[in-house]
């Protein structure tokens, strides 16, 4: 019968001794510093009752290294550690310039779980059996991020493409468009755009097309009407001011706010190309710096440049950079107190009218033709100077009688003019009116048709309709209107509110924008005279000429 060998089941612990590079141990702290640091300072006669700064400890170690002659004869940047330094740093050699960084883990205030292996020398170390047991990992709870990505330089760099990189991407036409869409490029600002404060601006690529008759590509970008040639792109870094300008345009609604998921997916697609392009540029730059340091005799800078170039040319370092996963910074979760529903802005008077029988007034062609046909804005046949959501009722939002709004509703040839009641004491804004306003009751003989059931609705006799005392029969142009119709004054739209949408030449709906922005672009002749816009909450079919809207501004 053969021998039987019992094998212990694996439990996640190592069963044999081997050499490997280990992370630094978690230190035992005595007061403000680790036990190793405190003992080292005690051996030099230092008082550790109060915390000694890292700068002072680093200076003390530098003097100790010079005094003991611990610099490596073949490489003056390396230190051959003696017994004291081995106990302190846990390795036989260190870089002289890394002493300050190596001391960070020895301070209790800096204790964390981040990996600090890159500060240590690449040499195998013998570790004890207790270190070979698999360590339990604790879950680190990260700060929650918002849905949208922050518009900061670190995020924009992940999607920023220089001119030289775009030219490299052109060598693969099959993937060129997919990599360009959604990325950011830097172009010169339009000299005729007086709203642009900086000579260059960051724009997002929204489309790619071939130039007619050639194989060259043209880019369609935001905030720029014309197509952009690749030859005019910038090959330099963007500035912080340009990034802030991009952020402001996104806040104004000129660009779509990117989400974290969208930006992460796009950054992963571009990471490999960006890293290879950066490595080539950096190595070429170091070559020029090395030549310059040789000419000037800068020995210290020359040594640093040579080390950095050697590191970047190392295949392992290049592979590590390519494996890095770009991380997107999320927008801070800050509640915006200004965001509210449209119902919150509805006045009490408008709410009262929307619930009254006046909301059932019948549509008539006379109302459509009374004020100039196409030049006026209508909602189902009723005159509207500022569209609202209540069908059949028009909020002219006029400023009759010192800022009191007036609503006009039409039924056939009759018009009901409703004014907000004056205060009981007859004083508005601290002023006494010169003449008391006229008050009249609605005549019950005026029929008002109900659209729902066809029956005539008689106004409530108790309702009081206040007529403005300064209404005249003549309008501003000297033309006489129907005496039954009250004078309608149109209040300008809110110029700063983001209320307006339009359709661009590519067929995409853009907006919302404010009238201030639209007027600036119209003055710069970006739009034709037949350019149409419409308000949020309405359909594209209700679009009106921008020139007509701007007349009311």
UniProtKB/Swiss-Prot annotation:
Residues 447-461 have a biased composition (Polar residues). Signal peptide: none annotated. Residues 497-551 form the GYF domain. Residues 466-480 have a biased composition (Acidic residues). One of its GO terms (molecular function) is DNA binding. Residues 150-275 form the Plus3 domain. Residues 26-109 form the SWIB/MDM2 domain. InterPro entries: At5g08430-like, GYF, GYF-like_dom_sf, Plus-3_dom, Plus3-like_sf, SWIB_MDM2_dom_sf, SWIB_MDM2_domain. Transmembrane segments: none annotated. Residues 335-357, 447-482 are annotated as: Disordered. Residues 343-353 have a biased composition (Basic and acidic residues). This is Uncharacterized protein At5g08430.
